Design a protein with these regions (language model features):
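Acidic, PIN/NYN-like endoribonuclease modules and their adjacent C-terminal/linker elements
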Residues: 1, 103-130
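Short, well-structured N-terminal submotif of metal-dependent ribonuclease cores
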Residues: 1-37, 51-66, 109, 123
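Histidine- and aromatic-rich ligand-binding microenvironments
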Residues: 5, 38, 94-96, 117-118
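Alpha-helix capping/helix-boundary segments
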Residues: 8, 41-42, 82, 102, ...
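Residue-level signal for well-ordered alpha-helical positions
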Residues: 15-16, 48-51, 70, 89, ...
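General small-molecule cofactor/ligand-binding pocket signal
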Residues: 36, 76, 129
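Phosphate/NTP-binding elements of NTP-utilizing enzymes
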Residues: 45
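Active-site neighborhoods of divalent-metal-dependent phosphate/nucleic-acid chemistry enzymes
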Residues: 57-58, 70-116
Length: 130
């Protein structure tokens, strides 16, 4: 299994051209093993819609239901272990709580994280597909 950063999940569902060919290959490759989506990504999507930073073709609740039903997608709960890990990441990591939780989720599950976020890509304490 790999863990998807929120924007990767949204781009994949929307067929967004910002996904690189390598990222598309990884999504196909790991589909049978699991594409983990942190529960916090659902909140992130809802907040992006609320702030008009993301437009969806249907109500956000419907979109989430459909996007979570995509082949290989596994919703990963925000467990107490992940919550604590997100506050104790090694070395200084940026302050976005959602990114902290997504990184902690990947670390807790011992899975690679797929992202295009420069701040996460420069963080050496998480396994990344890049």
């Amino acid at each position: 299994m790999i863990v998807l950063d929120t924007h990767i999940w949204v781009w994949w569902v929307h067929g967004d051209p910002r996904l690189t060919s390598q990222q598309n290959q990884w999504l196909q490759q790991y589909e049978s093993q699991g594409l983990g989506v942190s529960a916090i990504s659902c909140r992130e999507v809802a907040k992006l819609v609320e702030y008009n930073r993301l437009t969806l073709p249907c109500p956000v609740g419907d979109w989430l239901s459909q996007a979570l039903a995509y082949p290989g997608v596994r919703l990963l709960e925000l467990t107490p272990e992940i919550a604590v890990e997100s506050t104790q990441l090694p070395v200084v990591f940026h302050r976005d709580p959602a990114d902290q939780i997504i990184v902690a989720t990947a670390r807790t599950y011992n899975c690679a994280l797929l992202t295009s976020d420069a701040k996460i890509l420069s963080y050496p304490h998480v396994n990344l597909l890049k």
